[in-house]
UniProtKB/Swiss-Prot annotation:
Coiled coil: none
Additional detail: The porphobilinogen subunits are added to the dipyrromethane group.
Enzyme Commission no: 2.5.1.61
Keyword entries, A-Z: Porphyrin biosynthesis, Transferase
Matching Gene3D superfamilies: Periplasmic binding protein-like II, Porphobilinogen deaminase, C-terminal domain
Gene name linked to the record: hemC
Pathway: Porphyrin-containing compound metabolism; protoporphyrin-IX biosynthesis; coproporphyrinogen-III from 5-aminolevulinate: step 2/4
Function of the molecule: Tetrapolymerization of the monopyrrole PBG into the hydroxymethylbilane pre-uroporphyrinogen in several discrete steps.
Name of the protein: Porphobilinogen deaminase
Record's subunit section: Monomer.
Length: 292
């Protein structure tokens, strides 16, 4: 049996695909696996922010097409980069155990404090708004490109610091670059940050991913994505959600910024098997507060 695994071309995307491949091979040593990488539209357009070029769908369109055309059997994604509406023909068939979900700040090589005369680079309004709260008066500017490209721009002196996801740096073996780790209270992470998602066609036998799949990650991802979807939040809309499993419950924290720039943050607990309802009800409560 041969499985073709589709991935974006970046070093981090390939590393994440390799994590999935290693798990499949560990439990199914007879399966032959081929990695197929491709550049997505989102990888090609680097001079505009995500919301200006059509949102998260631009990072999955080519991978979805390859799946539908039968060119690959599964695709591997950072779950946080996937659009809220997923093609019914291409379900998520497995998710990884969650890596550290926190956001971090990285300084240029050789520096050990932020020079506030220069901008802090970050890729989403979610991070921007929360960083401006932590460092009042700082300048935050957009940054695009994969993790290594962003680090290159930082080290060239284009930014005084950049905000990134802990998980990406850890998977790339670049943890030593981390200068400050923000708690999930200081910066609420993007929904599903730190989780790898595997997508396939409906007829795919996902049993080869049974040992890879993590139920805790799945349950919190359902709640987090439900919250964002209820707010109509795409990639750069200022919203975030972070769920933690406590026994049979999920404690879900939602973050939302209304059109006037007012920040709302609320936590709600619900049954772990009712994540969709929990995310939706938290979003409705926050929108009610925003309309009041």
């Amino acid at each position: 049996m041969k499985i073709r695994v589709g991935s974006r071309e970046s070093k981090l995307a390939v590393r994440q695909a390799q994590i999935v491949i290693d798990s499949i091979k560990k439990y199914n040593p007879d399966i032959e696996i081929e990695l197929v990488t491709m550049k997505t539209t989102g990888d090609k357009i680097l001079d505009k922010t995500i919301d200006k070029i059509g949102g998260k769908g631009l990072f999955v369109k080519e991978l979805d097409r390859a799946l539908l055309d039968g060119k690959v059997d599964i695709t591997v994604h950072s779950f946080k980069d996937m659009p809220m509406d997923i093609d019914d023909r291409l379900p998520i068939v497995a998710v990884s155990k969650r890596e550290d979900p926190r956001d971090v700040l990285v300084l240029p090589k050789g520096k050990n404090e932020i020079d506030f005369n220069g901008p802090i680079g970050c890729s989403s309004s979610r991070r921007k708004i929360q960083i401006e709260k932590i460092y009042p008066g700082c300048t935050v500017e957009p940054i695009r490109g994969n993790v290594l490209t962003r680090l290159e721009k930082l080290d060239k002196g284009e930014y005084s610091a950049i905000a990134l996801a802990y998980a990406g740096l850890k998977r790339l073996g670049l943890e030593e670059r981390i200068w400050r780790v923000f708690s999930t209270d200081e910066i609420v992470p993007a929904a599903c940050q730190g989780i790898i998602a595997v997508q396939a066609r409906k007829d795919f036998d996902a049993s080869i991913l049974a040992n890879f799949h993590d139920k805790d990650s799945w349950d919190v991802s359902v709640a987090e994505r439900s919250f964002i979807k209820a707010l109509n939040g795409g990639c750069s809309s200022p919203s975030a959600a972070y769920g933690v499993i406590q026994g049979e419950k999920i404690v879900l924290t939602g973050f939302y910024v209304d059109k006037n720039g007012k920040i709302y943050k609320m936590t709600k607990t619900g049954d772990r098997n009712q994540g969709e309802a929990l995310g939706y009800s938290l979003a409705m409560e926050m929108l009610k507060g925003a309309d009041a």
